[in-house]
Amino acid sequence: WEARTLWGSLVNVSRNLAVKTRQFVAPEGPQLDRMRDLIISFSYALKDHLRGEPHITNKLSVQVPENIKHTPNFLASQMYAELKKWNHADQLTGEEFWAMDREAHMFLEICGACERIKSTLMSRSWRIVTRQCIILYLLLTPWALVEEFGYWTVPVTVVGAYFLISGEAIAHYVESPFGIREDHLDLDGLCAKIEESVKEICDT
């Protein structure tokens, strides 16, 4: 749920920064196009970063140097470079600059929180204890039930084992929500949503 909340926040801050760029800096032109491309590229770069995939995909509309290892950081720094340039050119008032700075700041906050989720996995000892409990259940339950349930002991034990094993498998996927399985967070869909929303704000 935390990962879903973070990516929901990324959708919102992407829209907010696009709106503020258009309203505060330029209703159209290369400045707006540049920030639009940075915002869209950030979401795809973060997706690839969390999945451990190559950091340059065909969805990135911003050129990223080959020596860059952390593409989301690079793109966020480019956003700040744009803000700094506009501020020095007096295209932003102090209040407008701080309003946009708050949005830009959130990109790295979200990235850091997602990295924490990815790196903070369930401890190995906890996994071992969980599996030992399941094995113990499978070994002891039939003996506890056989006198009362007779032949029904087997299906009762199987059903219980199914739910225990399923719960352990679900916990494994939940602790690492950024993969590509159906049970994982739909990062591709969220990136496409951000791209669609930001383009709608900037191009219409």
What are these regions (language model features)?
Residues 8, 14, 18-21, 41-45, ...:
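Small-side-chain structural scaffolding
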Residues 10, 30, 34, 38, ...:
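Aromatic-enriched hydrophobic runs in primary sequence
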Residues 11-43, 49, 178-204:
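Solvent-exposed, non-transmembrane helices and loops of integral membrane proteins
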Residues 17-126:
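Structured inter-helical modules in multipass membrane proteins
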Residues 116-204:
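Alpha-helical transmembrane anchor segments
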